[in-house]
Amino acid sequence: MMPNLSCFSVAISEPTCHDPDSGGHFGGPDGYGGRYVPEALMAVIEEVTAAYEKERVNQDFLDLLDKLQANYAGRPSPLYEATRLSEYAGSVRIFLKREDLNHTGSHKINNVLGQTLLAQRMGKTRVIAETGAGQHGVATATACALFGLDCVIYMGALDTARQALNVARMRLLGAEVVSVETGSRTLKDAINDAFRDWVTNADNTYYCFGTASGPHPFPTMVRDLQRVIGLETRRQIQYQAGRLPDAVTACIGGGSNAIGIFHAFLDDPGVRLVGFEAAGDGVETGRHAATLTGGLPGAFQGTFSYLLQDEDGQTIESHSIAAGLDYPGVGPEHAWLRETGRAEYQPITDSEAIEAFRLLCRTEGILPALESAHAVAGALKLASEIGKGAVIVVNLSGRGDKDIEAAAKWFGLLGTR
């Protein structure tokens, strides 16, 4: 019988050799990360940093988080061997880390439970968050309902239209959903408005950042809260396959689910770490969200990392069929891993992702999020590259209920026959 694999408090409390410096830079003072925010936010961010450093080693805080993750969120999540998908890929073993089975349907709950509990410990009564696909918004609204906190979710107007089901879920959970009409009306614009709210209402408000980006300490804090994915996976794959995998894959927008599963394998050079970005209509078309493939270093929304920008340094609008990947930036630790060569980042187009979405439905009876489908598509490419006998882990970061309408339209399934 498999042993209890709970390792959530370990993920948060134990520092690693891959942590940033005191200023939040990965790769030294001139590296990626840091704090690029207005002076009005510096004191607030310092308050969050101090609170997190205190609570991450507070046993009462850790014990409560462990209980919530086990009894409320449903951890550990299973590692499932997808035998029919593996047969399709050709004599490989593909394992799915089932973050889609967590409460609220994605990996987002791992981060949100920790941050909302931190907000409560800090005496905040109001929590704000940004969301793209709606999964982080749903998770935040859920946790705020659990802790009795007011909740406001900022979401681009384009995303509220294509993720209407999650908008309804957030409102049912008691959250106010603010539709952002400025800019490209997607995730980056939702983040901008959330920052404006935070500056104005810092006394009673906590900003629950959803991805491993933004100003320090958010990239590190979100990573720590998501590290449980990789720590569980490492134990599970050795138990089920008898060895470490040849490759670990994940989709990547801002990068929280990817850094969460990658981190436990950083010191294993025999394990390839591959993040699959949203190539949209193709990187060559300019309509994509493949930041590490087609972007350049620069400061964006509080951090120094890669972003999609023109020759004048202005941010370029991103595009992806997956709202959660439709973002022109990426977390600074991923930029550092790319620079060092420890992780690889490859583009997957909309059409490749949605074909993988359908394939997983029909081979395994699993409906993945369109974001996660990018990782499935990428794993199939890796399978042919690595060859027979390969063991590949895919982080299935979320479920696809929210994407049924988009997929049905793509495949022409909504008409009568």
Curated annotation (Swiss-Prot):
Chain segments annotated as transmembrane: none
Listed CDD domains: Trp-synth_B
Domain of life: Bacteria
Reactions that this protein is recorded to catalyse: (1S,2R)-1-C-(indol-3-yl)glycerol 3-phosphate + L-serine = D-glyceraldehyde 3-phosphate + L-tryptophan + H2O
Record carries keyword Amino-acid biosynthesis: yes
GO CC terms of this entry: cytoplasm
Pfam families: PALP (PF00291)
EC number: 4.2.1.20
UniProt keyword terms in alphabetical order: Amino-acid biosynthesis, Aromatic amino acid biosynthesis, Lyase, Pyridoxal phosphate, Tryptophan biosynthesis
Enzyme class, broadest EC rank: lyase
Cofactor(s) essential for the protein: pyridoxal 5'-phosphate
GO MF term (any one): tryptophan synthase activity
Pathway info: Amino-acid biosynthesis; L-tryptophan biosynthesis; L-tryptophan from chorismate: step 5/5
Modified residues (N6-(pyridoxal phosphate)lysine): K108
Family named by the database record: Belongs to the TrpB family.
Quaternary state and interactors: Tetramer of two alpha and two beta chains.
Function: The beta subunit is responsible for the synthesis of L-tryptophan from indole and L-serine.
HAMAP family linked to this entry: Trp_synth_beta
Protein name as catalogued: Tryptophan synthase beta chain
Source species of the chain: Mycobacterium leprae (strain TN)
